[in-house]
UniProtKB/Swiss-Prot annotation:
Modified residues (N-acetylalanine): 2
Short motif (Histidine triad motif): ranges: 275-279
Keyword Nucleus: yes
Organism from which the protein derives: Sus scrofa (Pig)
This protein's name: m7GpppX diphosphatase
């Protein structure tokens, strides 16, 4: 069973999902409002399933592509993506359920073992629902299952291939600036160091509902602009990185009573968006992107920069790309030539 997270006195709403679970920068930029506990409706009428883009029995999640608003006279309707995910259990609610007389159907019984289908009440049967609407072809491809391929990017590859490719894309991060400028999600900020050069904000990741600690997940977003990724880091950024590591761990300890040795603190490369940010997750949580091919522990990043000022400009970095990613083709062609 999951630990129960302490509930702050004025905690407001949470929302969602990264990688395949994450909203794109365009999606995040659009959500500048705050949530509400009042009943609401989906932002479209009807939903005719066209395709299951992806599903995972292990993660209890499914990604659906559908047509909406078909009855409103908009021709063939519009595309939308709906992501349905079972929410984690909460100890107090489950304990209360089992103390009562839950509705059960026996599936299997043998000696001391038995399996049932249990039909929970409404408060235990919620499904986290993420909507991407209107959805573009780019969104559909993003959530569609794709094979992954490992690539090894040299420092030269980054300067000559990856960076020009990124600069050719329209990768808006206005949603990040909205958070930093308190235009959106200000009520969700757990901690802030306001220093414009070496400060940051700490905010719960959208994948974490803050109702239990087993899947604790927060993001530190630096105030300083222009640091795109690990490749940009030099000793000039050590004060910022040390602040994020030390103050982020202290803030999480104070707020959630989780010590630093129970946290995984790391950066992604490649990141999902190009403004420096650091992930804080519960050590036992298998967070998306926490594998060795993408996660770089912040403590080791700091040590690498202390020992070699140009470590991340020189080092060959390994990461995975989807089969349909144009960058994969560019890097593979360069390595063959």
């Amino acid at each position: 069973m999951a630990d129960t997270a302490p509930q702050p006195s004025k905690r407001k709403r949470e929302r969602d999902p990264e990688e395949a679970e994450a909203p794109s920068t365009e999606e995040k930029e659009a959500r500048v409002g705050n949530g509400t506990s009042a009943p609401v409706r989906l932002p479209f009428s009807g939903f005719r399933v066209k395709k299951v883009l992806r599903e995972s029995a292990r993660d209890k999640i499914i990604f659906l592509h559908g047509k909406v608003n078909e009855a409103s006279g908009d021709g063939d309707g519009e595309d939308a993506i709906v992501i349905l995910e079972k929410t984690p259990f909460q100890v107090d609610q489950v304990a209360q359920l089992l103390m009562g007389s839950p509705e059960l159907q026996l599936q299997f019984s043998n000696d001391i073992y038995s399996t049932y289908h249990l039909f929970p009440p409404r408060q235990l049967s919620d499904v986290k629902t993420t909507v991407v609407y209107p959805a573009t072809e780019k969104h559909l491809q993003k959530y569609l299952h794709q094979d992954l391929h490992l690539v090894r990017e040299t420092g030269g590859d980054y300067k000559n291939i990856t960076l020009p490719h990124l600069e050719s894309q329209s990768l808006s991060i206005q949603w990040v600036y909205n958070i930093l400028d308190k235009k959106a999600e200000a009520d969700r900020i757990v901690f802030e160091n306001p220093d414009p050069s070496d400060g940051f904000v700490l905010i719960p990741d959208l994948k974490w509902n803050q109702k239990q600690l087993d899947d604790l997940y927060l993001i530190a977003i630096c105030h300083r602009r222009g640091i795109k990724s690990l490749r940009d880091l030099t000793p000039e950024h050590l004060p910022l990185l040390r602040n994020i590591l030390r103050e982020g761990q202290e803030a999480i300890l104070q707020r959630y009573q989780v010590t630093g040795d129970r946290l995984r603190v790391y950066l992604h490369y490649l990141p999902s968006y190009y403004h420096l940010h650091v992930h804080f997750t519960a050590l036992g949580f298998e967070a998306p992107g926490a594998g060795v091919e993408r996660a770089h522990l912040l403590a080791e990043v700091i040590e690498n920069l202390e020992q070699d000022p140009e470590h991340y400009q020189r080092r060959t970095l390994t990461f995975a790309l989807r089969a349909d990613d144009p960058l994969l083709t560019l890097l593979q062609e360069a390595q063959r030539s």
